[in-house]
Structures are given as structure tokens and as C-alpha cells.
């Protein structure tokens, strides 16, 4: 389980300028056009979703700084930039190497055992499944991991 994060706006012009065709209409936390931007999951580095105007964390900040957008999670909790920084950008260190890695104890008899997991956490999306999905991800200039595809 993890938590999904969104950026949303009620401004149609901002939607058209920054979201292109990739948005959803939602009523949580209020009526907004939203775009999925990130997910945090236990043991993993945060994962960000790339889009038309978002290719880096700096791009998310740029949208937020226009004051036409809000950031919130799937439960409707709104975040200012400092709260988003604490909750998402620093989650499990945020980028590979920011915190010491710890060995994952693997029990082949456990119902939760996953042969594709790397040996250490926090887990990078580049390492999962022995790198089979690495081409679906890229790092922004700050080292945050972005997916080229939609996910939730």
C-alpha cells in the first residue's frame, strides 16, 4: 500500500496550459482538474509521474508557485510546499544515497516473498526486477525518480 499525490486546479486556462490532455475531473478535495504527480510506498523511494509539463520536481514547484494549483493526497489532505517536501520529497531519503541503505531480510517461505526485489532498501525503481523496468524511468536533475507511464 502507498499514498498517491495529485496537483489540481479549478482554472481551465491553467489546465489547458499545463496539463494538456492528461487530467481527470475530481470532486476530492473539491471540484478540480487533477493530475497524478507522485506515490510513496513503504520501503521504496518516492516515484513521480512525468507528464506534458512535469519532467522534474522543479516543474511541480513551478506549477505550485503560480498559486493556481494545490497539492493533495488521495485522502483529500492538502499540502503546502514545505509539507509536500517533508511528506514526499524526503520520504525514505527521497533520492538514492540520501540515507544509508539496509539489507532486506528475505524469507523464501513467506507469502510476501518477491524474487524481483533487490537486496537493499530504500528500493530504487531502477533496481526492481533486476533492472527490467529501468527504461520506463528517468531521474530528474536532483535525482528524483520519474516514471514515463501512468501508475497509481
Which residues does each PLM region occupy?
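Short, extreme N-terminal segment that most often corresponds to the first beta-strand
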Residues: 1-24, 150-152
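Low-complexity intrinsically disordered segments
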Residues: 26-152
Amino acid at each position: 500500500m502507498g499514498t498517491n499525490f495529485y496537483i489540481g486546479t479549478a482554472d481551465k486556462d491553467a489546465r489547458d496550459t499545463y496539463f494538456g490532455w492528461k487530467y481527470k475531473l475530481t470532486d476530492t478535495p473539491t471540484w478540480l482538474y487533477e493530475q497524478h504527480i507522485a506515490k510513496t510506498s513503504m520501503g521504496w523511494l518516492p516515484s513521480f509521474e512525468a507528464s506534458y509539463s512535469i519532467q522534474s520536481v522543479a516543474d511541480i514547484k513551478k506549477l505550485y508557485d503560480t498559486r493556481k494549483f494545490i497539492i493533495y493526497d488521495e485522502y483529500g489532505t492538502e499540502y503546502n510546499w514545505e509539507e509536500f517536501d517533508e511528506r514526499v520529497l524526503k520520504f525514505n531519503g527521497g533520492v538514492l544515497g540520501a540515507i544509508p541503505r539496509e539489507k532486506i531480510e528475505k524469507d523464501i517461505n513467506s507469502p510476501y516473498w518477491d524474487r524481483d526485489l533487490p537486496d537493499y532498501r530504500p528500493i530504487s525503481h531502477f533496481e526492481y526486477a533486476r533492472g527490467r523496468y529501468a527504461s520506463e524511468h528517468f531521474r530528474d536533475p536532483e535525482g528524483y525518480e520519474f516514471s514515463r507511464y501512468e501508475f497509481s
